[in-house]
């Protein structure tokens, strides 16, 4: 085995270890947040939960606690959007497309610990989490706007309201449903159906 191959293998191992440690810190941050809230989720508490030192936290997240929670929120946003895009592509028709986006958001909101952070307390921490908040909502609104514009061109809508405004209102309803589901995960089906019923009023009979 050449020295180059050994060096590459060592570098790859270090990268995997670094990624694993980073993920463990993110999981510890979420766990600490769910137990004590943002105010008491200090770097010391997060490091202790992960079995790491404060230095390790700062080595991976130079901004400390805020950097940790920004990345955590961004990861959840990206996962939500990816799931939404998957379900949206499989949907057939406006009603199914709207339901698909609601389902994606409520699935994430229903997860233990995750829903508390992402759907309830996370958005309220705008100062600490900027500029990563609102990305999932923005992506949802963009997809909905295109769907509504397409339906309007086909004469399928029962409203003449601006699709951009309607899309923002629908996302707001989904976010509100996400708060409920984060606290009561067993209501995910009920809330998804409610969003669909709300959307049905937009479509001509």
Residue ranges and their predicted role:
Residues 1-9, 107, 141-142, 146-154, ...:
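C-terminal peripheral helix-coil segments that are non-catalytic and often amphipathic
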Residues 17, 21-29, 46, 68, ...:
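Generic hydrophobic, amphipathic alpha-helix propensity
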Residues 24, 28, 32-67, 71:
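Helix-turn-helix
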Residues 81, 128-154, 164-168:
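Amphipathic alpha-helical packing segments from all-alpha helical-bundle domains
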Residues 87, 116-122, 177-184:
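Secondary-structure edge/capping motif, primarily at the C-terminal ends of alpha-helices
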């Amino acid at each position: 085995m050449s020295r180059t191959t050994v060096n590459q293998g060592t570098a790859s191992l270090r990268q995997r270890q670094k990624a694993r440690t980073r993920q463990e810190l993110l999981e510890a941050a979420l766990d600490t947040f769910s137990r004590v809230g943002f105010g008491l989720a200090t770097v010391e508490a997060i490091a202790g939960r992960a079995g790491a030192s404060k230095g390790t936290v700062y080595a991976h997240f130079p901004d400390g606690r805020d950097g940790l929670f920004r990345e955590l929120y961004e990861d959840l946003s990206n996962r939500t959007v990816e799931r939404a895009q998957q379900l949206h592509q499989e949907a057939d028709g406006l009603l199914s497309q709207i339901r698909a986006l609601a389902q994606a958001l409520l699935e994430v909101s229903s997860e233990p610990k995750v829903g508390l952070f992402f759907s309830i307390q996370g958005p309220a921490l705008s100062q600490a989490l900027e500029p990563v908040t609102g990305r999932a909502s923005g992506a949802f609104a963009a997809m909905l706007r295109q769907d509504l514009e397409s339906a309007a061109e086909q004469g399928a809508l029962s409203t003449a309201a601006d699709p951009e405004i309607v899309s923002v209102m629908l996302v707001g309803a989904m976010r509100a449903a996400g708060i409920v589901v984060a606290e009561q995960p067993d209501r995910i089906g009920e809330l998804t159906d409610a969003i669909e019923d709300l959307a049905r009023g937009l479509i001509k009979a």
